[in-house]
UniProtKB/Swiss-Prot annotation:
The keyword Cell division applies. It is an enzyme of class 2 (transferase). This is UDP-N-acetylglucosamine--N-acetylmuramyl-(pentapeptide) pyrophosphoryl-undecaprenol N-acetylglucosamine transferase. The lineage of its organism: Bacteria, Pseudomonadati, Thermodesulfobacteriota, Desulfovibrionia, Desulfovibrionales. The keyword Acyltransferase does not apply. UDP-N-acetyl-alpha-D-glucosamine binds at residues 11-13, 124, 165, 192, 246, 291. Pathway: Cell wall biogenesis; peptidoglycan biosynthesis.
Length: 365
């Protein structure tokens, strides 16, 4: 491969698998140019820059469920497709891979209009609208979970797993010495954009967590960082580490005994590869409730506990968290179950699939 475009955007759940594949491509093909094509309004430009990738932004926004604003979004999509089409002509990619999200719709469709080979990757247990539509025009659909095998034409699908960054794969491969029984560490993450319901539940739990000697590393999201930081200071929880965004998530996973987080597909895949027990709080307004389906994949295998957001106010969250953190045997069983579901080779499997696709797919000039 000489030139590859990876296209997606919106949330880390789409973006981080693309970055994992970029890592794998650059490790195998150091001379290959990888271009990241994403939306102008999400975190993808910053994340691509941190990963050392060239970035092209498209003026696209979500259309689904936006009412009258969908008209403006449709114009943005048309402009995004036009820009992506122009970029395809200049960059001349060998292949284009989309990871869902509206930027991927523009990028992959433009690739097909240019006659370039293209494929898509679906992270969730319930396929997104973008990938359901694009599956009609691409020859290969990479899947993360067996639950989605029936959602796409079987002759196009490849069950590859959800690509996870190499640093997290390394974290899952390490076997650290057991911590002393009195050391309990809780990692709280609300996804790349944060989660107010999770933030509030943890703040309410701080007195009980402090009494139990629980250390907390809390990713709040940028919008909630100042408020939650002040709450930690007011409660006197000296063991709290509060950040808007965790750059080195592999170190955070390695540090943690238990993770409290949303159930985005990439979070679930990372938990499995890292072998981390979790309490999962699915985002209840996700399209087609896909986060609940993602969560149940780990919960049904004994690797996680499901806490629905609507039940938080009726749940003794401090007792749940302290109880799990105090039960080393259960945490160890959950960790083993999580690791058994992990696909540390997913990025390699996707790149293998791209190489094979290039061998069999004609390219228009």
């Amino acid at each position: 491969m000489r030139r590859v475009i990876l296209t997606t955007g919106g949330t880390g759940g789409h973006i981080f698998p693309a970055l994992a594949v970029a890592e794998e491509i650059r490790a195998r093909y150091p001379e290959c140019s990888v271009l990241f094509m994403g939306g102008l309004y999400g975190p993808e430009a910053d994340l691509a820059a941190r990963a050392g990738l060239d970035f092209v932004g498209l003026p696209v926004r979500g259309v689904l469920g936006r009412g009258v604003r969908a008209i403006g979004a449709a114009f943005g999509m048309a402009a995004g497709i036009a820009r992506a089409y122009a970029v395809m002509g200049r960059f001349d990619p060998d292949i284009v891979l989309g990871f869902g999200g509206y930027a991927a719709f523009a990028g992959v469709l433009a690739a097909r209009l240019r006659g370039r080979p293209a494929a898509i990757h679906e992270q969730n247990s319930v396929p997104g609208v973008t990938n359901r539509v694009l599956s009609r025009v691409v020859p290969r659909v990479f899947l993360s979970l067996p639950d989605t095998l029936g959602a796409f034409p079987p002759q196009k699908t490849c069950l590859a797993g959800n690509p996870v960054r190499a640093s997290i794969v390394a974290c899952g491969a390490e076997r650290s010495d057991p911590r002393p029984d009195h050391v309990r560490r809780l990692l709280v993450m609300g996804g790349s954009l944060g989660a107010r319901a999770i933030n509030d539940a943890v703040v309410s739990s701080l007195p009980a967590l402090a009494e139990a000697g629980v250390e907390v590393w809390h990713q709040t999201g940028a919008a909630d960082w100042e408020r939650i930081r002040k709450a930690y200071a007011e409660t006197g929880h000296g063991e709290g580490r509060v950040e808007a965004f965790i750059d080195d998530v592999a170190s955070a996973y390695a540090w943690a005994d238990l993770v409290l987080c949303r159930a985005g597909a990439t979070s679930v895949a990372e938990l499995a590869v890292a072998g981390k027990p979790a309490v999962l709080v699915p985002y209840p307004f996700a399209t087609h409730d896909h986060q609940t389906h993602n969560a149940r994949w780990l919960v049904s295998r004994g690797a996680a506990v499901l806490l629905e957001q609507k039940d938080i106010s009726m749940t003794d969250v401090p007792a749940l968290l302290v109880g799990l953190l105090s039960d080393r045997a259960r945490l160890n069983r959950m960790a083993v179950s999580a690791r058994a579901q992990g696909r540390p080779d997913a990025a390699a499997a996707v790149v293998d699939g791209l190489v094979e696709l290039l061998k069999t797919t004609p390219r228009a000039r």
